[in-house]
């Protein structure tokens, strides 16, 4: 008997069970962030997970089931909570796909002298503070007796152990802060909500507005379409469980050092 084959088949069976379970998950799924990745994830989930009521949440979208939400605005979050409370389905899945690398005024810093406090605060607001405050907003709706998944898109550049090139001070630090927030939260929720799972995700470099100014530095085979990135991320979320909560995982399912 080949023990390697037994182990491999057992692992495959476990993953298949996870996929089957996820496909039977019933309830409300919220995808927060109506940019390229978020919209694609919401689209793919609504097609593949027929028992989930998928709602895309963000500032604007033509998605068929959409809630307006400014994740950086406390009043908007209160209205968001009211919509969850009034919804008939149990909350089962939240995916945060918000993030900002650049804007008209915000640019990733190449060296120390480029640092600006206002820009640093903007980066931390959307990339660190808002995701954890989103978790705070939805916490009261986490089911006690059903599995619940919260996934947040981070970035490999937020890894301190993986930082080999420097630069991008604010974005790196903000994503590192997000990672620390959710690592701590995964420990708290493991005690309070044993069926909850938190996953931090690195989607790779995706062909969206966030990364578009930097595409020339990315090899063609490492620049993913939103469709491919969505498939990677959904498959990762499907295969997580409370036993693996608090992990920082790349698009290829490899674990990233903190």
Per-region residue spans from a language model:
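Rossmann-fold cofactor-recognition segment
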Residues: 63-75
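A hydrophobic alpha-helix adjacent to the NAD(P)-binding/active-site core of NAD(P)-dependent oxidoreductases
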Residues: 66, 112-115, 123-124
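C-terminal helical subdomain
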Residues: 208, 212-258
């Amino acid at each position: 008997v080949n023990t390697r084959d037994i182990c491999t088949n057992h692992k495959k069976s476990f993953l298949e069970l996870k996929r089957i379970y996820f496909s039977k998950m019933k309830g409300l799924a919220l995808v927060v962030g109506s940019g390229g990745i978020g919209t694609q994830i919401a689209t793919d989930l609504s097609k593949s997970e027929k028992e989930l009521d998928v709602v895309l949440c963000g500032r604007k979208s033509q998605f068929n089931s959409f809630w307006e939400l400014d994740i950086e605005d406390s009043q908007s979050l209160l209205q968001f909570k009211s919509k969850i409370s009034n919804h008939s389905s149990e909350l089962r899945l939240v995916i945060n796909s918000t993030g900002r690398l650049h804007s008209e005024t915000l640019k990733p810093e190449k060296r120390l002298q480029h640092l600006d406090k206002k820009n640093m605060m903007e980066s931390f607001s959307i990339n660190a503070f808002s995701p954890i405050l989103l978790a705070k907003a939805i916490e009261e709706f986490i089911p006690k007796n059903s599995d619940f998944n919260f996934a947040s898109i981070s970035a490999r550049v937020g890894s301190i152990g993986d930082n080999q090139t420097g630069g991008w001070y604010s974005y790196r630090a903000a994503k590192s802060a997000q990672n620390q927030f959710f690592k701590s939260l995964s420990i708290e929720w493991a005690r309070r909500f044993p069926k909850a799972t938190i996953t931090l995700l690195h989607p790779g470099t995706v062909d969206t507005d966030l990364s578009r100014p930097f595409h020339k530095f990315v090899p063609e085979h490492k620049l993913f379409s939103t469709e491919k990135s969505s498939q990677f991320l959904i498959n990762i979320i499907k295969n997580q469980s409370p036993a693996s909560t608090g992990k920082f995982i790349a698009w290829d399912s490899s674990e990233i050092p903190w």
